[in-house]
């Protein structure tokens, strides 16, 4: 209730002033295939709790999620029509964004998809919320707990096979701890088990589709051709096969920002590790990106970590996680 209450403003002589919070109307939620329930819930529930109706368009990769939401809301007694879902093509989705009955659009997905939504909504003067991709960086300072940094950054890079908007996609390590970090990271990655997502011993599943794996393979090979060193052998991951969504993890060193793997969203199980000489070099490289979703710094000096974090061009900043 407090979150939906009017916002009181300072009184003026003869006036009482407040900002009244009211429902927008119809909220069109466009949800992605990765974390298909969580990302959708983050948009659906605030909209409904604030008194809006919701139309959900889920990814073609995860169509049953929409239907499960509908079943759950029916079982909960939500009034008919407050939540609806549509299975749509990209063209149909654009048409819904343009429809005058839609009062707000909440989109989670790729940068190209977000650009489509923004373009389709242009001139309608409605609110549009966009949560897009990232090339999220991490920096391991000289004073960091290396074992902890390896554990957290590797998990951040390979969790969900790297298919996370907030996944760690590039890592900068101070030269004084670079070798120790790299060796521990290699050991960590080699323990991953590539397998079917329904197998109990699998710790690294397939990508969402073959074309996604092909994209990461091409990006990785291009970096190797430019001088990057690959530290993981695909031979250790028998399910890795071209023409399938199964892709072995990869750690790349001797990388730089001339390589797409360090500047373009990968959304897969590959991460580049670059040596830096100073905090300033790390900050400059972390900010050398068109993205700005999350970033992390690993250090034992929390005060210094906060100082560095304030120099980062990012929406969310973490220390030691």
Q: Which residue ranges define each predicted feature?
A:
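A short hydrophobic/small-residue beta-strand
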Residues: 53-55, 230, 316
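Rossmann-like NAD(P) dinucleotide-binding subdomain of oxidoreductase/dehydrogenase enzymes
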Residues: 7-148, 276
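Long amphipathic alpha-helix in the N-terminal Rossmann-like dinucleotide-binding domain
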Residues: 1-3
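Conserved C-terminal structural/oligomerization subdomain of aldehyde/semialdehyde dehydrogenase
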Residues: 102, 193, 239, 246-321
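ALDH superfamily catalytic-core signature
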Residues: 104, 112-256, 280, 285, ...
